[in-house]
């Protein structure tokens, strides 16, 4: 039997998740059908979404000063181990300018958090602002195998790590199971 404290706690979690999902898409902001994404990674490579067609893509936007971003990166790194053998690509994009956080500091931040997927910088927020008119971090954008945005864009890590990973897992698995235009 669930006591009153447990009921209140479960209700609060459910309300938090429902409100977060309802607010995930920025009001009045229409998502781009084919987002433009050509960003240089800290590894020197240029990452272009057009070249990633055929894979599901998870892009996490964040910043070194964002505490929930750090927690989210740990959760995403754990998810990455589950999807390593599948056509899923993970990326982390810092929205900080070089004068705010140097490349060396950004590399150190990623290394300290054991981030094994590519780290990039969107200094002018040109990619970031395609999905939202204001800064809310962390922000996750999922793209299907055809490079189309899978709405809603998700802001913040709205739940405990296990619940968050379960939600991301559900969305990734749905995208993996959906055939691309070329597979139909």
What residues fall within each predicted segment?
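Short active-site neighborhood of thiol/selenol oxidoreductases, capturing the structured segment around
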Residues: 48-70
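Non-globular targeting/processing and membrane-anchoring segments
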Residues: 172-184
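N-terminal "domain-start" segment that seeds a small globular fold
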Residues: 22-49
């Amino acid at each position: 039997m669930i006591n009153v404290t447990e009921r209140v706690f479960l209700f609060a979690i459910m309300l938090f998740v429902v409100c977060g999902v309802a607010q995930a898409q920025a009001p009045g902001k229409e998502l781009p059908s084919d987002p433009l994404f050509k960003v240089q990674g800290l590894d020197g490579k240029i990452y272009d979404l057009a070249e990633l067609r055929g894979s599901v893509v998870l892009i996490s936007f964040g910043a070194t000063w964002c505490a929930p971003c750090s927690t989210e990166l740990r959760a995403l790194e754990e998810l990455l181990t589950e999807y390593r053998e599948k056509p899923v690509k993970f990326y982390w994009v810092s929205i900080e300018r070089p004068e705010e956080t140097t490349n060396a500091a950004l590399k150190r931040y990623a290394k300290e958090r054991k981030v094994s997927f590519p780290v990039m910088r969107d200094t002018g927020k040109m990619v970031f602002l395609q999905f939202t008119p204001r800064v809310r971090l962390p922000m996750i954008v999922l793209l299907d195998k055809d490079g189309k945005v899978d709405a809603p864009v998700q802001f913040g890590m709205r739940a405990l790590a296990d619940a968050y990973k379960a939600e991301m897992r559900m969305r990734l698995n749905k995208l993996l199971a959906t055939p691309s235009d070329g597979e139909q």
